[in-house]
């Protein structure tokens, strides 16, 4: 009978933990030194049976089975060692379950003990000059993936001899010098994964050795974060670029690094950081990749930690003028897009609630400040304007008959458009030439992304549309001069959406007073607050509301029936406020 096809193909693998449990069970149950082993009992029975002349053949067979089981342990330990090493490597990238290592070939050695002995012996021979540099590098290359060989060999060599090997690694093949470095990198990475520790008394990994290897193999995440922490110091700049590249390729390590250094990073990566002991210009691009991995996460990374990193940096840049590099501002744009649903909730929910772990729950003013920092980069500006246009369209189209959706769409486009306009005004106040360059890049990028020009992206609506396009030479300037009527030095902070939220809640209260079944609040109570009412008799949120009641209230405020009922009252008040702010009546 054939094996049913479970979709797994011909893959055979090992779960290292389960194999370890099996090894311990076999050792304890069939050996003479195991706790609760049956072997001593069987031997005792055989002795007694022999004394009284009973047949002991069956007991002898049991003992043979016990001996056979004990004889399998070295082989099983070898398989478990190979599997555990690969599992640890893959675990840093979020992969779990069975692995292929150890399921088939045992490598060049039948047991872990044999591999370890060979690793130590070969290293000693090299140290004693009994084998040449090239021959030893060939041995390392042949056994670079063997954790038992690597652990014993690296331990015997020590940090300083390994550093010498790094400098001489091209001797493996002078025509292909990178082969030796790659083999040594795998050798050291597997040794460290198997437990070799090179840290000094202060807990620092050796930068001079490992910075030259980390981009040639997969090193443990904690090793990368240790090296990266050291690279924040000005004296270690020479090692940092290779470390930044390796860190960016490991989302788990990058997320932890950003988390551990979140308070210092804005200073480290500020715009003039090269002159203040921080990030140097040639390495900005590679560090930007670290920052993106640390805020967005990826395989193996903790999404809660990544969101927490983002929350802290969004909050920081919403209240500081400590501008960063354009590359970081582009990362911020990517982050805004990645957390787009969180941005939308913050900007448009009539009653924002905590979005929970793995999300960025910040006030709309925080996102506005973060968007403002990102838009210092004109390419990022164009991408964010295109993103906001697409998001607004999707929100509006999702519920075309619901005024709440249309209001949300306007809030999204208005927020991003306002921040872009504010950035333009600030740049123009300092240097009109820079502003023209910024605008030109935005226009070019938008033309590529949207297939149209910046005049449409910044079109404030009917007022601008009354002006002939032929007369529009500087749409942004036209917008700020004829529509907003606020000079750069008077502009201040962006208008908070809290005011419209007050209007929305007040209009909902007025409508609810007329109809207590408006929007069927009970259905939202059933979904979000275990049936507990969330409204007072006059349509306000109950005091000391639970998170579930707050969520129910937020969703009820967006109900189509509620939005349609309050639409007129809300619009009259909201548009009146907007007119007084902008001068458009």
Predicted segments with their positions:
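Non-catalytic all-alpha helical scaffold/repeat segments
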Residues: 89-584
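Short, solvent-exposed mixed-charge patches
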Residues: 1-4, 581-585
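N-terminal secretion-targeting helices of virulence/extracellular proteins
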Residues: 1-106, 110, 114
